[in-house]
């Protein structure tokens, strides 16, 4: 399986890293991570795979493998539980003091072989009681190193060595009786050591990078500088930078030319002032000479500029009317424009609305052009953009009414022409008859009805209609009568009164739909003809045919056809006719 390299980013203190223990990672998962992902080391592929080392090993394959002696591991028999307590109490604060490790330990300076040789030769000259010990020597050398690092931190560059008087301030904390006697001689030795090491610290320190070329091959240089690859600049960025530089050069050149032109202008002004002053001085001399010699001539030489002659105004041929006075709007004291110059909110909204409409129309046209010559056959096609579309086969129907043509001349009599009606004006002429078409509203004009004729199956002719309003749907009887029986429960004693329309045809339709077989009628009365008197009226017989207690049908008044019917008023209840007892017909004896 091919491995892929993963370039990991630099670690940062702001990035949270997951810490996993050994038991949290399975062996198979660890092997897959180590085999699939290879961390990019930043070196060449040949050096990374060590081809040269593999070639050397293959060449020396016949050589016998030499075993390297390694001491065998031995188990430690130390029992740390006996020396350390089991329960460890954590302190409230881990920081006990702010001193560094170097400040806590003893002197940081360690004697070298040269120091030991110098100290032996120095002590040979002194008595045994006045000799300098190795610890005091290290303490003095350490003070000199610390003071030099504080006073001259860049002594390795400028080769500056602090004086002996500056070093005495660091020797004050030490024992003056033992140290100050040897301070001068130790300072001279320390100064010679610094000069030999090119004024570098005598204590062993880490070697940092000072010069990139000389320190490149030095293996002891620590903390090398990280080489950051510069970002590759594309051609577009180069062109943009070049344009900016050209524009800047042009602007600077224009500014330079303006400054030069202004400088030349000021020089010309200075020359002109000098010439005018010289002319003034010469005229003053001429004036004095004229006064001294008594010359009385014109003073044209003393005048710098002659006044120009003005043309005489021409007489107007015709008196022109004065122009109308201009009406000026009063200026406001605060300097703001007048209300007529201010932009109205309605105008601003109208402009925004017009811009929005133009943008929408442009997008609609772009959408139409984009879908041109394409048919959307997907499961859920896009809805067509609202706009003018062609209705194939549909033609709008335009209603036109033809006026009645005038009577033909041939239909009249062929006799002599009769005088016109204008010759004999009528006293009360009839009002002119005005013809009005079908009322059309704006909606019908915007969407006129259209029709299409097509032939279907079995050569049947179909007429398709568009734009006609659908008829209003009547509510069902249950929905229409639902509100009629919604009575409040406050007045339970009163009988419910239902609102009925006396002119509604639903009741008549319901009664007309009842079959005759289901209606129970009383049997017709039996009339004994022998008891009928000879002069009985048919109306009396009709009245006697009803049983006692049965109501007589009341004749409903029929409205006159010439009169207009009253409008239905559903708010007024209609009282139901109550049955009235009729006298029973008695047989005639």
UniProtKB/Swiss-Prot annotation:
Cellular compartment(s): Nucleus
Biased segments, Pro residues type: 567-589
InterPro entries named among the record's database cross-references: Enhancer_polycomb, Enhancer_polycomb-like_N
Disordered: annotated segments: 298-339, 403-430, 468-497, 516-589
TM region(s), chain numbering: none
Biased composition (Low complexity): 557-566
Chain intervals with Basic and acidic residues compositional bias: 474-487
The UniProt record lists the keyword Transmembrane helix: no
A GO cellular component entry from the record: NuA4 histone acetyltransferase complex
Oligomeric and partner information: Component of the NuA4 histone acetyltransferase complex.
Similarity section: Belongs to the enhancer of polycomb family.
Function text: Component of the NuA4 histone acetyltransferase complex which is involved in transcriptional activation of selected genes principally by acetylation of nucleosomal histone H4 and H2A. The NuA4 complex is also involved in DNA repair. Involved in gene silencing by neighboring heterochromatin, blockage of the silencing spreading along the chromosome, and required for cell cycle progression through G2/M.
Protein name: Enhancer of polycomb-like protein 1
Underlying gene: epl-1
């Amino acid at each position: 399986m091919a491995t892929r390299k993963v370039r990991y980013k630099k670690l940062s203190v702001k990035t949270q890293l997951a810490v996993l223990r050994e038991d949290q990672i399975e062996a198979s998962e660890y092997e897959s991570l180590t085999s699939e992902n290879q961390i990019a080391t930043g070196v060449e592929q040949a050096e990374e795979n060590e081809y040269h080392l593999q070639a050397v090993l293959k060449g020396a394959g016949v050589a016998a493998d030499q075993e390297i002696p390694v001491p065998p591991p031995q188990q430690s028999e130390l029992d740390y539980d006996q020396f350390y307590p089991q329960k460890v109490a954590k302190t409230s604060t881990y920081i006990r003091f702010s001193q560094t490790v170097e400040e806590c330990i003893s002197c940081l300076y360690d004697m070298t072989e040269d120091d030991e040789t110098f100290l032996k030769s120095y002590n040979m000259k002194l008595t045994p009681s006045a000799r300098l010990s190795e610890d005091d020597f290290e303490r003095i050398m350490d003070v000199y190193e610390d003071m030099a690092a504080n006073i001259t931190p860049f002594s390795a560059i400028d080769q500056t060595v602090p004086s002996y008087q500056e070093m005495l301030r660091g020797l004050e904390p030490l024992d003056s009786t033992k140290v100050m006697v040897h301070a001068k001689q130790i300072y001279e030795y320390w100064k010679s050591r610094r000069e030999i090491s090119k004024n570098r610290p005598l204590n062993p320190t880490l070697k940092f990078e000072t010069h990139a070329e000389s320190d490149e091959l030095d293996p002891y240089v620590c903390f090398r500088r990280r080489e950051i690859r510069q970002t590759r600049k594309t051609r577009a960025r180069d062109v943009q930078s070049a344009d900016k530089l050209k524009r800047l050069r042009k602007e600077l050149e224009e500014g330079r030319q303006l400054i030069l032109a202004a400088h030349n202008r000021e020089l010309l002004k200075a020359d002109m002032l000098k010439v005018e002053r010289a002319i003034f001085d010469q005229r003053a001399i001429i004036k004095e000479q004229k006064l001294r010699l008594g010359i009385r001539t014109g003073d044209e030489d003393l005048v710098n500029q002659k006044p120009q002659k003005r043309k005489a105004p021409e007489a107007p041929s015709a008196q022109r009317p004065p122009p109308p006075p201009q009406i000026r709007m009063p200026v406001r004291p605060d300097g703001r424009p007048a209300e007529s110059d201010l932009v109205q909110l309605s105008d601003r909204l109208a402009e925004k609305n017009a811009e929005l409409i133009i943008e929408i129309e442009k997008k609609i046209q772009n959408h139409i052009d984009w879908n041109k010559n394409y048919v959307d056959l997907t499961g859920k096609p896009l809805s067509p953009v609202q706009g003018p579309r062609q209705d194939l086969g549909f033609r709008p129907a335009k209603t036109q009414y033809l006026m009645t043509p005038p009577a033909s001349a041939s239909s009249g009599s062929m006799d002599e022409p009769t005088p016109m009606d204008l010759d004999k004006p009528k006293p009360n002429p009839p009002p002119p008859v005005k013809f009005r078409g079908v009322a059309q509203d704006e909606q019908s004009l915007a969407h006129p009805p259209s029709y299409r004729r097509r032939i279907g199956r079995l050569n049947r002719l179909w007429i398709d209609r568009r734009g006609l309003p659908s008829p209003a749907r009547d509510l069902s009887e249950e929905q229409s009568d639902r509100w009629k029986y919604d009575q409040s429960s406050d007045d339970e004693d009163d009988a419910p009164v239902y609102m009925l329309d006396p002119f509604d045809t639903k009741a008549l339709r319901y009664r007309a739909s009842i079959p005759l077989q289901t209606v129970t009628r009383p049997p017709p009365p039996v009339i004994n003809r022998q008891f009928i008197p000879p002069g009985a009226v048919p109306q009396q017989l009709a009245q006697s045919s009803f049983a006692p207690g049965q109501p007589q049908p009341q004749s409903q008044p029929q409205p006159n056809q010439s009169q207009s019917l009253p409008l239905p008023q559903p708010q007024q209840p209609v009282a139901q006719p109550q049955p009235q007892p009729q006298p029973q017909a008695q047989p005639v004896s």
